[in-house]
């Protein structure tokens, strides 16, 4: 035996490893003429037959994951035991019953899973897998349905939004155009009015000039010409024209009678005021000095003081109305002439 070789008995390896695991042999190998690692070691010593090597390779390729539950291991063993030709699809009755159960409740409880498996003649794991796949398909369809519904709502809202934007633009354009037209209408009449007024101020028309000329002429004529029915104030010699003297030898006073009834209904003038003042002055002068001579001859009113004067009701009313309306002011010359007339009347009486 070559001292550079190590030979292990395969029987010892089988006894040490009941599962049939093989041990590595260090030393020479192969044939005596070969230069391999196991040079000079026959193949029978290695204890590796082809049948065991093939079965061990198949077992090594189907290694189980580390984190697995007991139920999963049992289910895997169940599926591994069934050959591909032995696996069968679900029948229509089983699918209908599973669908009805899923519609009632999409969550699968352990008791319910066991009951369904017993009634359908299926494995509990197979029922759980079917429910899991059906729930995934239901979620996908639900998402698709929600997506279609939301997309339709979005499209409707987008169409309404575009319609509102177009209406807004159209209404805004109308408002702008109407505002411009309104501003033009408000600006044009005001400018035309201002221009016309300026032209009228700068260039008065013929009617305005004629009216102004006529008005000035009328005012001048009214100031220059006496009013209608105006009479010149009587002269001092004519003051006693309507009166008479009574020389009956009894020392009676002469009576001056003023006839103011004539023209009482006409416009009151300065002469009416003058005669009224003269009558009042005469009444004051003759009061208490002379006695009434003849009531029949005079035909006038008799006062308590013995002075006779003729003032009819119409003249009295005219004098009262004239006093209420206001007396036309005379100038200084007319006042002096009236005073002189009153003194002359008193003197002749």
Swiss-Prot record:
Tissue and organ expression note: Expressed in seedlings, roots, leaves, nodes, internodes, flowers and embryo.
User: What InterPro entries does the entry give?
Assistant: HD (IPR001356), HDZip_class_I_plant (IPR045224), Homeobox_CS (IPR017970), Homeodomain-like_sf (IPR009057), HTH_motif (IPR000047), Leu_zip_homeo (IPR003106)
Renumbered to this chain, region (Disordered) spans: 181-253
Q: Which residues bind DNA?
A: 83-142
| Keyword Ribonucleoprotein found | no
Q: Which GO terms describe its molecular function?
A: DNA-binding transcription factor activity, RNA polymerase II-specific; sequence-specific DNA binding
Keywords per UniProt: Activator, DNA-binding, Homeobox, Nucleus, Transcription, Transcription regulation
Highest taxon of the lineage: Eukaryota
Disulfide bridge partners, by residue number: none
Q: Tell me a GO cellular component.
A: nucleus
GO BP field? positive regulation of DNA-templated transcription
Q: Where is the composition biased (Low complexity)?
A: 188-198
Quaternary structure note: Homodimer. May form a heterodimer with HOX4.
Q: Which PANTHER family match?
A: HOMEOBOX-LEUCINE ZIPPER PROTEIN (PTHR24326), HOMEOBOX-LEUCINE ZIPPER PROTEIN HOX5 (PTHR24326:SF215)
Provide the function of this protein.
Probable transcription activator that binds to the DNA sequence 5'-CAAT[AT]ATTG-3'.
Per the record, the similarity remark reads:
Belongs to the HD-ZIP homeobox family. Class I subfamily.
Return the protein name.
Homeobox-leucine zipper protein HOX5
Q: Gene name?
A: HOX5
């Amino acid at each position: 035996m070559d001292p550079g070789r190590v030979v292990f008995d395969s029987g010892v390896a089988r006894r040490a490893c009941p599962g049939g695991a093989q041990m590595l042999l260090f030393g020479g190998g192969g044939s005596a003429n070969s230069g391999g690692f196991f040079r000079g070691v026959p193949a029978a010593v290695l204890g590796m037959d082809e049948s065991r090597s093939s079965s061990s390779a198949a077992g090594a390729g189907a290694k189980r994951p580390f984190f697995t539950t007991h139920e999963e291991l049992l289910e895997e063993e169940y599926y591994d035991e069934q050959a591909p030709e032995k696996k069968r699809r679900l029948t229509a009755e089983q699918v209908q019953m599973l669908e009805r159960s899923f519609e009632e409740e999409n969550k699968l409880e352990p008791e319910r899973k066991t009951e369904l498996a017993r009634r359908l003649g299926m494995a509990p794991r197979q029922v759980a897998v079917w429910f899991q796949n059906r729930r995934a398909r239901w979620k996908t369809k639900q998402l698709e349905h929600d997506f279609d519904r939301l997309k339709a709502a979005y499209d409707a809202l987008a169409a309404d939004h575009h319609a509102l934007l177009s209406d807004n633009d159209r209404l805004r354009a109308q408002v702008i155009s109407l505002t411009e037209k309104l501003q033009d209408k408000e600006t044009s009449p005001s400018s035309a009015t201002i221009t016309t007024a300026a032209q009228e101020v700068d260039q008065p028309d013929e009617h305005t000039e004629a009216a102004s000329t006529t008005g000035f002429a009328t005012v001048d004529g009214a100031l220059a010409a006496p009013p209608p029915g105006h009479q010149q104030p009587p002269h001092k010699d004519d003051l006693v024209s309507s009166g008479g003297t009574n020389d009956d030898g009894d020392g009676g006073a002469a009576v001056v009678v003023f006839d103011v009834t004539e023209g009482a209904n006409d416009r009151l003038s300065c002469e009416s005021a003058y005669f009224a003042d003269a009558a009042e002055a005469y009444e004051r002068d003759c009061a208490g000095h002379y006695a009434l001579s003849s009531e029949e001859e005079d035909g006038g009113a008799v006062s308590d003081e013995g002075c006779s004067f003729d003032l009819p009701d119409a003249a009295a009313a005219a004098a009262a109305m004239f006093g209420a309306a206001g007396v036309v002011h005379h100038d200084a010359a007319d006042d002096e002439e009236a005073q002189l007339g009153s003194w002359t009347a008193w003197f002749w009486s």
